[in-house]
Design a protein with these regions (language model features):
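Conserved active-site regions of diverse hydrolases
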Residues: 2-5, 24-173
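Sec-dependent N-terminal signal peptides
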Residues: 7-16
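Alpha-helical transmembrane segments and their juxtamembrane interfaces
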Residues: 17-18, 53
Length: 173
């Protein structure tokens, strides 16, 4: 049953992302992007193996969206745990602890950004990925199903998580 809910959540997120992208329309190229580095923050959808495995097929035959974009520019993106610049971790929430699986050691997106900013800065040709919120929604729905929160409170928590993510994005620009 939880799998069906997760599948629906992923489909809604994918459709919303596609609609947002389609709304951008077309444009002309002023100057071609030539990125030096790819840096990522987020949850399972952006995780490239922070804890040893990814939230996809792990035989190397499938790349997630960050790996696909980096490869289009002849670059790679690897987890911080392996010396790279992808801070994203599966089950990470935006600011709340523990993560959606109950692991208090998983860095929140806020903590991921804190770690990067404590040891580095963005360059003019860096590409930054940030994707989060699914784990917050899953935790909220689990609380509703467990009877520990109301649907209205879950919606309010989701709105707050969205505002917290916007705050983190503003730190990056």
């Amino acid at each position: 049953m939880a799998t069906n809910w997760m599948r629906r959540t992923v489909m809604v997120a994918a459709c919303a992302s596609a609609a947002l992208l389609a709304a951008c329309g077309s444009s002309t190229t002023d100057s071609e992007l030539t990125p030096d580095r790819f840096i990522a923050f987020g949850d399972a959808f952006t995780d490239v193996g922070q804890k040893g495995s990814r939230y996809t097929v792990n035989d190397g035959s499938v790349s997630n969206w960050t790996q696909q974009l980096a490869s289009r520019y002849g670059k790679t993106i690897t987890p911080v745990a392996s010396g790279g610049l992808s801070y994203a971790a599966g089950n990470a929430r935006i600011t709340a602890k523990p993560d959606v699986a109950g692991d208090a050691t998983t860095l929140t997106v806020t903590e991921q950004i804190d770690r990067f900013l404590a040891g580095g800065a963005f360059g003019a040709n860096d590409v930054v990925f940030i994707n989060a919120g699914a784990s917050d929604l899953i935790a909220g729905m689990a609380a509703v199903r467990a009877g520990t929160t109301t649907p209205a409170d879950m919606v309010a928590s989701a709105r707050k998580a969205g505002q917290e993510l916007a705050t983190q994005v503003r730190r990056l620009v």
